[in-house]
């Protein structure tokens, strides 16, 4: 009888990527099939996030539910991974002794051995070490699920913003070798992927080793990925303003595959608060990046992250954030009230903004950005938009749905052969959460750029050096 795996994932896109790799890995090593029902599972994995408030309590609340399942099935294997596991591994073991496996973001590739250890009789396994980039060398080949895919290109962060736990939970910045990244993307392109989203906690800090001993910059990587035939839409998440160099802006000038939509976190509009956060840039420097981007891509839309109610933030400083929002004209945001993260420098600062004031500021900020987003959507009425078709519409299975470059959902009447391809749509209706339109052009009428076939990348000879690290030769 086939054994089942249930994974519950919280947090960022990197966690979503990690969870998909766990599923692929355990399917290849143990034949575990994914199930949406925890009650059916033989292995339960919780992939955690420590960014949000009360992250630890949320974990223990979920584990309490799974404890009841373990009482009914003593052979059930329970594992906790992700950033809370990395930060609170020993505490989880003490407070939830029924948890079998505790692993960090950098040790998920060791899950097969950990499960084997538990099934061989070991009481518990804890591995929250930071073996750099080893996990990518131990994961199975990627499997495409639809026309879009995430590809992790680097891990960790060296910036140590005062409010953030990422450097402590995912370690310092480590970039994947260039050829490993290109090989994975070429494999996905061979399977029909058309849009790739490059992932990293500080993605534009990518400095990937090349097979000849050199270093590939993030800007160079963007051009190389965009040149792979079939990859006709390219995104990246999450970037840092202090790493947003002019060579990246130049890619926006001459690389049509790179979308006219950018997520660039700023967190606040007050220079004093930015200094307290140790962000490493001013509001003017942030606006300078946006100005340069719009000089080469006038239609680019920007989303961002904001923290309101940071320790010591005054009403005047919050207004500076609101002024920045208006000046940049953000299309979207991930915005949150400040809450202290244990072990971070900001946790030692007086949290002197009341919860009521934080919530009020958050409401004001989100209303402003929602209004700006609605204006962007209304401006799309009557325009032609290139849409990547994802499948049948959730609203009407007789119609199709897809996304624009700026992440708007578009529903339209189409044919099944359009799924997984691009179509140009004239927008006829604008709704709160979606758009509607008519097909004006199919992919075979677009003349998309053709540079290098995925097979040409895959066919490069993969070799290993004396340390067993894979590389590509000529």
Swiss-Prot record:
It is an enzyme of class 2 (transferase). [4Fe-4S] cluster 2 binds at residues 157, 161, 164. NCBIfam families: miaB-methiolase (TIGR01574), MiaB/RimO family radical SAM methylthiotransferase (TIGR00089). Its cofactor is [4Fe-4S] cluster. GO terms for molecular function: 4 iron, 4 sulfur cluster binding; metal ion binding; N6-isopentenyladenosine methylthiotransferase activity. [4Fe-4S] cluster 1 binds at residues 12, 49, 83. It comes from the Bacteria. GO terms for cellular component: cytosol. This is tRNA-2-methylthio-N(6)-dimethylallyladenosine synthase. Residues 143-375 form the Radical SAM core domain. Binds 2 [4Fe-4S] clusters. One cluster is coordinated with 3 cysteines and an exchangeable S-adenosyl-L-methionine. CDD domains: Radical_SAM.
């Amino acid at each position: 009888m086939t054994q089942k795996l249930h994974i519950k994932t919280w947090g960022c896109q990197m966690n979503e990527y990690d969870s998909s790799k766990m599923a692929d890995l355990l399917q290849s090593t143990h034949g575990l099939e994914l199930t949406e029902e925890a009650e059916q599972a033989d292995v339960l994995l919780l992939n955690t996030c420590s960014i949000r408030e009360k992250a630890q309590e949320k974990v223990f609340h979920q584990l309490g539910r799974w404890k009841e399942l373990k009482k009914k099935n003593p052979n059930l294997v329970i594992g906790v991974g992700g950033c809370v596991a990395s930060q609170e591994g020993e505490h989880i073991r003490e407070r939830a002794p029924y948890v079998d496996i505790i692993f960090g973001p950098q040790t998920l590739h060791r899950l097969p051995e950990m499960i084997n250890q538990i099934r061989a009789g070991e009481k518990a396994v804890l591995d929250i070490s930071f073996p750099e980039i080893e996990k990518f060398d131990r994961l199975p080949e990627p499997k495409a699920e639809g026309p879009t895919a995430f590809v992790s290109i680097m891990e960790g962060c060296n910036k140590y913003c005062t409010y953030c736990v990422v450097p402590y939970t995912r370690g310092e910045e480590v970039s994947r070798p260039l050829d490993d990244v290109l090989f994975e993307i070429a494999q996905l392109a061979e399977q029909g992927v058309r849009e790739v989203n490059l992932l990293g906690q500080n993605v534009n800090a990518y400095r990937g080793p090349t097979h000849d001993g050199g270093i590939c910059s993030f800007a160079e990587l963007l051009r190389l990925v965009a040149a792979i035939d079939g990859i006709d839409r390219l995104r990246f998440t999450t970037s840092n303003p202090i790493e947003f160099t002019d060579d990246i802006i130049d890619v926006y000038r001459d690389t049509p595959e790179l979308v006219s939509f950018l997520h660039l976190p700023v967190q606040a509009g007050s220079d004093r608060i930015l200094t307290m956060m140790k962000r490493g840039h001013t509001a003017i420097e942030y606006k300078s990046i946006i100005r340069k981007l719009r000089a080469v891509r006038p239609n680019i839309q920007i989303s961002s992250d904001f923290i309101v109610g940071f320790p010591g933030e005054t009403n005047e400083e919050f207004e500076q954030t609101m002024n920045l929002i208006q000046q940049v004209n953000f299309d979207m945001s991930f915005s949150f009230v400040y809450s202290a993260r244990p072990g971070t420098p900001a946790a030692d600062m007086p949290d002197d903004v009341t919860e009521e004031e934080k919530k009020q500021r958050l409401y004001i900020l989100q209303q402003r950005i929602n209004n700006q987003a609605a204006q962007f959507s209304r401006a799309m009425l009557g325009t032609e938009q290139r849409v990547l078709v994802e499948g049948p519409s959730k609203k009407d299975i007789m119609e199709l749905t897809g996304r624009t470059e700026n992440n708007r959902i578009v529903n339209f009447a189409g044919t099944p052969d359009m799924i997984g391809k691009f179509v140009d749509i004239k927008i006829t209706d604008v709704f709160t959460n979606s758009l509607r339109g008519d097909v004006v052009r199919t992919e075979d009428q677009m003349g998309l750029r053709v540079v290098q076939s995925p097979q040409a990348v895959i066919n490069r000879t993969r070799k290993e050096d004396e340390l067993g690290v894979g590389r590509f030769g000529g």
